[in-house]
Amino acid sequence: RATVDRALRLIEQGALDQAGIEALAERLGIGGRHLTRLFRRYLDTTPLAAARTARIQRAKRLIDSTDLGMTEIALASGFGSVRSFNAAFQQVYRRPPTAIRRRAAG
């Protein structure tokens, strides 16, 4: 479980935003398949899904606490494009990020 906790900390710091699972696993001293198995065993998810969740949470915090534009938030949160940011955000919150910001402001 300690390896999964370390992996989660690295993911929250953006470890999978630029590199893949193999690079993260190497930093942890294990193989990528083993890392994925550990995530499934302890968290019932995958490292990529955990990274996506971390990016969405990071974006939500930025929406709530800054006046940054959505493009800046998408990139600062680790998304490769505004389109992927909008799609992921809408899937989780069932509304686009701009609607969340309007709701928070109103």
Where are these predicted regions, by residue range?
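DNA-binding recognition helix and immediately preceding turn/loop
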Residues: A2-I56, K60-N86
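…primarily DNA-binding HTH/wHTH and HhH modules…
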Residues: A87-G106
